[in-house]
Amino acid sequence: IITGTLGKTLGGASGGFTASSAEIVDWLRNRSRPYLFSNSVPPSLVAAGMKAFELAAGASDLRATLKANTARLRGGLEAAGFTIKPGPTPILPVMLGDAALATRMADELLARGIYVIGFSYPVVPHGQARIR
């Protein structure tokens, strides 16, 4: 069984997918509560997701650039004293701890033309507010 999201991996599309044998997919369609109480992904988003996969498959130079840019940003933020949650993805959670601080920082960065979102409880555990 392979599952994935179109929301985070493919530039803000919506929905997700499960790939498996026909038997398992049929079982999930009939038993999975989230599937039973949701709508199918619209064809336009399926097309956008397929195109994003197509572009990503042929964009090794862009992936390499993204990886290098992510490493550079991580290094710069850490050198400036920020704590960055570790991980292999280009999403860099800047750990701030305080929810009010995360909100203020997100607002200030937006005023400077940098779009980040502040996350705090209940989205993340108490004391682990962050921006990303």
Residue ranges and their predicted role:
Residues 64-73, 78-113, 121-123, 127-131:
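Conserved PLP-binding catalytic core of the aspartate aminotransferase-like
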Residues 1-88, 101:
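Active-site C-terminal subdomain of aminotransferase-like
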